[in-house]
Amino acid sequence: MPAVAITGIRQTGKTTLLREEPNLQGRRYVTFDDFAQLEAARQNPEDLLSGDDPLTIDEAQKCPELFTALKREIDRRRRPGRFLLSGSVNLLLLKNMSETLAGRAVYLNLHPFHRREILGQTGSAPFLPSLFKALAPSGAPRESPFSGGAILSSGGPHLQPRLRVDAPPPPIAPHELLKGGMPSVCLGEVEDPSIWFRSFEQTYLERDLRGLSQVADLIAFRRVMQMAALRTGQILKQSELARDAQLNSMTTGRYLDLLETSFVIARLPAYLNNRTSRLIKSPKLLFTDVGIAAHLAGVKDLDPASDEPLRGYLFETFVAQNLAGILSAHWPEARLHFWNVQGRHEVDFVIEDGRDSIALEIKAGTRWGEGDLAPLRTFLASSKRCRAGILVHNGQDAVHLGERLWALPMGLVLS
């Protein structure tokens, strides 16, 4: 494509990537964080885009006037990779910009760091895509998805064989959720993460948001952010959120749209391939970074003994953050959903690839019982093309529980 757009929530490292990636050296670089360069582009976008040298434009969404001129220049002279754009908003959700670049740009999302990156595990293939390929549609392994693949022992909580996993990744520690995946925080570049998160929030509200839309009441918008953080990992009930934020539903919906456009939240669609009228069709609300969600929700302690009511939802948000990064980089044809039968069963994540899928139920604790498997059993019974239903727990045992049913460590699933 003549244009490549790299987008993502602010502070994920887009500018660092554009400036320091060796393969991008030698390109002409402008940033619309520089007011002089922004004003020059507004006055004469054609002049900025002319020339044969490859051009990188950082924070491109700040100059909407650029995109019509960009379309004309691409149509005049198409050359792969000629323009590289970055932005802290989802250009696909901005109608005028997405329509202008239709058929002329490819979009890439730079997600917050996932655990594989933080632990330096990116030299190996991720586990989940490998598991999906290793399982036949019936759920029977074509080849072992585990290192070694041998049975360690019979027994365990369900008298099923445990599988050997060589050097399994460690369980997820509470501090991993509180830090999240923003590079400066999760890589230990800041001494006090709480100060960084407060600065992020202030900059987002006072600069990024104002550049995206006219929001008259920033206090009300911040209240919606906080109410949304308290609901991460849960089905979105907009009228209830609006009531708690003391706003009408229309204003609340507009604010949620702005949060989604700027990559602060995502709305996970429901999986609707099952033949039942009782399926929940409303999306699930998820923050794209679990650390930001915990900060906005005021969560300070996620130890099991703390009895934090959001603990399970924040673990689910952490898994979603990791899945988003892994699927984007290694399994782009996969689609992420959740499944809910009204008033009865919910499966936290369904990864769909063509007609086949894998279902994941997230358990924040290390212990689990038969009751935790009920949603997966129901989903497997209604979805014959699901290759595996996996109870993802924060322990270390990998257990095969029967046809298409597994209990696997969260550290392994996200490795």
Describe each model-derived feature in a short phrase:
Residues 14:
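Conserved lysine of the Walker
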Residues 6:
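Hydrophobic anchor at the beta1->P-loop junction of P-loop NTPases
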Residues 40-84:
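Conserved nucleotide-sensing/catalytic segment adjacent to the nucleotide-binding pocket
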